[in-house]
Amino acid sequence: MNAIKERKIVYTSGQIAERVRAMAAEIDAFYGDEPLVAVCVLKGAVFFFTDLVRAMRSENLELDFVRLSSYGKGTSSSRHVVFSKDVDCDITGKHVLIVEDVVDSGLSMQFLMRQFEARGARSLRLAALVDKNERREVDVRDRKSTRLNSS
C-alpha cells in the first residue's frame, strides 16, 4: 500500500512571484545597461526563467539555454556532468547569468561555471529559485561577484 505523505506549503505562489520580481530588480540594478546573457538550465528552470526575464527591464538581454545530465545508466545520479544541449551564443567577454530552479549538490553548477569560465565569460553569476545548502557537496560561488539569491 502506498502511503501519501502530507504536504506542507513552504512558499505561496504570491511569495514566489514577489521574490522573482525582487530578484529581477536586483539583477537590473546590478547590471544596469551592461549587455547580459541569461542562460536557462533546462528543463526545470524554464518557468522560473520565463518569469524572471519578463520581470527584468534590461534592453541588452540575450537569452540562451543549456541542458545538463548527471545521470549514468538508470536513475542513479553520478558525479559526471555533461551537456545534453550547450549554449548557441558565444559568451566570450560577456556577463553571464545562469538561471537554475534548484541548486542541490552544486555539481551541475560547478561544471557549468567552470565550462563558461574556460570560454572567457566576463563574469558569471547564479540566480536560483531554491538553494538547498544542506545538500551541497561542492562550493558554488559567483565569479567576480557576490550571490544574487542570498535573500
Could you describe each region identified by the protein language model?
Residues 1-147, 151:
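PRPP-associated nucleotide enzymes
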